[in-house]
Regions:
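Hydrophobic residue at the +6 position relative to the catalytic HRD Asp in the kinase catalytic loop
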Residues: 277-281
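ATP-dependent phospho-/nucleotidyl transfer catalytic cores
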Residues: 65, 72-79, 91, 145-150, ...
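A short beta-turn/loop motif at secondary-structure boundaries
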Residues: 107-113, 217-220, 388-389
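Alpha-helical transmembrane anchor segments
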Residues: 501-524
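Hydrophobic HxD+1 residue recognition
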Residues: 272-276
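N-terminal accessory/targeting segments that precede structured cores
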Residues: 1-117, 123-127, 131-134, 142, ...
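Helix-rich C-lobe and terminal helical cap/extension of kinase-like folds
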Residues: 3, 25-33, 179, 222, ...
Length: 525
């Protein structure tokens, strides 16, 4: 507890030192531009806050441009730790001197991030005379786990205060969101897990002309060290460079939409850390450019029920079927029982209808999202912590989409992908596959169920379907329905946000803790 109080005090001191109260009252404080002071303060606070800054850097629509531009530097300019420490970690983890693993190892980091830093190297060839493989070596930052765990404790304290003191604290579920954030960010610290994530994405997209994932060298990968193929793509941040190469941004944007939907629905495994530093473009064929993915520490999955109900919401939204969206939310009980479907339908239509027919460049997503939050408050919608990761990633992807092709017809591009998925998922072929998969088990259970029913009747117990049992069954059905409907975060909070967000997403690829502070800021505003 003392450590948390000390950390909170440290944060307060940094706010004063860097004059950050200027962002609240508008009164100039400190030396130098306020955006530089904000970036330096976030760097001083460590990985959790750096990630927050990274998320904000993709939101020039809700931040002044100079602040968004400065926060983008957090992605490349985190001070590196000494290469001597990196060498020690590599040798300790892999059990060999570096010279026995690599023909060449660069002491100058290629990139330095809040969780790890990356060095370039060349693996020793397996056969004499052969060429070594160009690789990148990702090394976990020393002491980062201790630092993150301390900041998680601070976030827990803040979340508890918000849940207790804020009028809408319970609905926002801040403690549950922090718990999800903790799991996600701690998973990011395991390099072996990241390598496995990359391997699965590579398998899902092997041979695809849309996106490429690097080879992972598991013989040289451990909990704190990851060795993978070095890619030579152009960062998506270098728009002028891509433009000079003649890259067709419209094709790039359309391919991004396709990748997003296929990762979420076809593969049920998506890249969830989509800041610009993690997206490269292969411009070798500018007319049909493709993507290259890096950094796989954060990924997401959905349950089959999540996928189905998200798909229903997407398609209803694309078809402007606001009645169906409202019905789904009322049925799921994510909004209070007794809510009139007509009222919720009208609220969704009011916010959503104006965005159709507009290019993304003409849509203020920040204003749109604030309106969606207003609907959520009005209908006492329960925030779903398990989907904050997805929502947070959508915010990142939306920021990237604005950098590509603002005139993309998102609805025309995305709708066929979703309809094809629904057809494959719910068509006769899929039903037959499920029957073949589950039929033998069901057939095996039937005799036992019949035998138990007969024995109950012989004992004079009946089948026991009294009023109490019926009530229990109803509760169980409702509970199962709520579980199945988790994915319906709501058109007001997710569906509308998604379809705007994905215009130009590279691949769907988080750190979900950035979402709940945004909600708290919205509450205060």
């Amino acid at each position: 507890m003392f450590g948390r109080v000390r950390r909170l005090w440290h944060i307060q001191r940094l706010v004063s030192r860097y004059g950050l109260r200027e962002f609240v009252d508008g009164k100039p404080r400190g030396e130098g531009p306020r955006e530089v002071r904000l970036r330096e303060a976030l760097e001083s606070l460590g990985p959790v806050f750096i990630k927050f800054g990274q998320a904000l850097s993709t939101r020039p629509d809700i931040l002044p441009p100079e602040i968004a531009l400065e926060l983008a530097k957090l992605q490349d300019r985190v001070p590196p730790f000494p290469s001597s420490q990196a060498r020690e970690i590599i040798e300790s983890q892999l059990g060999k001197p570096i010279d026995e693993i690599f023909d060449d190892f660069s002491d100058e980091p290629l990139a330095s991030a809040s969780v790890a830093q990356v060095h370039t190297a060349k693996l020793k060839p397996e056969e004499p005379g052969a060429a070594g493989f160009d690789v990148v070596v990702k090394v976990l930052r020393p002491g980062v786990e201790v630092s993150i765990r301390e900041d998680i404790k601070v976030l827990r304290t803040i979340a508890s205060l918000v849940e207790t003191l804020h009028p809408e604290g319970r609905r926002l579920c801040p403690k549950a969101i922090v718990a999800e954030y903790e799991k996600t960010i701690l998973d990011e610290l395991d390099m072996m897990r990241e390598g496995a994530n990359c391997a699965l994405l590579r398998r899902n997209w092997l041979g695809s002309p849309l996106i490429y994932h690097p080879v992972v060298f598991f013989d040289y990968t451990s909990e704190k060290v990851l060795v993978m193929e070095r890619l030579d793509g152009i960062s998506i941040r270098e728009l002028d460079h891509l433009r000079d190469r003649g890259v067709d941004f419209s094709v790039l944007a359309e391919r991004g939409v396709e990748i997003f939907f296929k990762q979420v629905f076809r593969d049920n495994f998506f890249h969830a850390d989509m800041h610009p530093g993690n997206i490269l473009v292969n411009a070798s064929n500018p007319a049909v450019p493709s993507y290259q993915a890096v950094d796989f520490g954060i990924v997401g999955t959905l349950t089959p029920g999540d996928q189905r109900y998200l798909a229903e919401n997407f398609l209803a939204f694309f078809n402007r079927d606001y009645r169906r969206i409202a019905e789904l939310h009322v049925e799921s009980e994510w909004i209070p029982v007794g809510t009139r479907v007509e009222d919720f339908e009208s609220a969704i239509r009011t916010v959503s209808e104006p965005i159709f027919g507009k290019p993304i460049k003409d849509i203020s997503f920040g204003v749109f999202l604030l309106r969606l939050f207003h609907i959520a408050r009005r209908f006492k919608y329960q925030v779903q912590p398990q989907l904050v990761l997805l929502q947070k990633t959508l915010l990142q992807v939306e920021g990237l989409g604005r950098q590509l092709y603002p005139d993309l017809d998102l609805w025309k591009t995305a709708k066929p992908v979703m309809e094809e998925w629904m057809k494959d998922r719910l068509g006769p072929g899929q039903v037959m596959q499920r029957l073949r998969r589950e039929g033998p088990h069901m057939a095996e259970m039937l005799p036992e169920l019949a035998s138990q029913a007969i024995k109950s009747l012989e004992r004079g117990e009946g089948l026991g379907v009294g009023k109490k049992t019926i009530a229990q069954m109803r509760q169980e059905l409702q509970r199962n329905n709520r579980q199945q409907m988790r994915a319906t975060v709501g058109a007001a909070l997710l569906v509308g946000a998604t379809v705007i967000a994905v215009a130009g997403s590279a691949h769907f690829p988080a750190l979900l803790g950035m979402a709940w502070p945004a909600w708290l800021i919205d509450r205060k505003s």
